[in-house]
Curated annotation (Swiss-Prot):
The keyword Chloroplast does not apply. NCBIfam families: PRK00132.1. This is Small ribosomal subunit protein uS9. It comes from Pseudomonas putida (strain GB-1). It comes from the Bacteria. InterPro entries: Ribosomal_Su5_D2-typ_SF, Ribosomal_uS9, Ribosomal_uS9_bac/plastid, Ribosomal_uS9_CS, Ribsml_uS5_D2-typ_fold_subgr. The gene is rpsI. GO terms for cellular component: cytosolic small ribosomal subunit. Gene3D superfamilies: 3.30.230.10. PROSITE patterns: RIBOSOMAL_S9. The lineage of its organism: Bacteria, Pseudomonadati, Pseudomonadota, Gammaproteobacteria, Pseudomonadales.
């Protein structure tokens, strides 16, 4: 990889994002679609932009992302995690601010499996005393 590009892998739930930061004007491209086209929900777009706004690098980089697996929320979280890692590769002094905001830590929460005899992971059938 060239020195003009920084890479970060982000994961959240079952989603995985590969993020490339290149010097540019602030374009964010996800699976060859713009951020606004890829994410219909404003909250998901906001989550993706959080590390850039925190480090004040919104219009400093063009970001190219390939993301797979999971749903909207998981993919947005994975992209945020990937951008955070790529920013730390670009400039290690940003780590402290990103850590305090909670973006560096991989959110380890996963879906709990369904158990035999239960309706869902924890929901039980109605109990009848008689």
């Amino acid at each position: 990889m060239s020195a003009t590009q920084n890479y970060g892998t982000g994961r959240r739930k079952t989603a995985t994002a590969r993020v490339f930061l290149r010097p540019g004007t602030g374009n964010i491209s996800i699976n060859n679609r713009s951020l606004d086209v890829f994410f219909g929900r404003e909250t998901a777009r906001m989550v993706v932009r959080q590390p850039l706004e925190l480090t004040e690098t919104v219009e400093k980089f063009d970001i190219y992302v390939t993301v797979s697996g999971g749903g909207v929320s998981g993919q947005a979280g994975a992209i945020r995690h990937g951008i955070t890692r790529a920013l730390m590769e670009y400039d290690e002094t940003l780590r402290g601010a990103l850590r305090r905001a909670g973006y560096v830590t991989r959110d380890a929460r996963e879906v709990e499996r369904k158990k035999v005899g239960l309706r869902k992971a924890r929901k039980r059938p109605q109990y009848s005393k008689r």
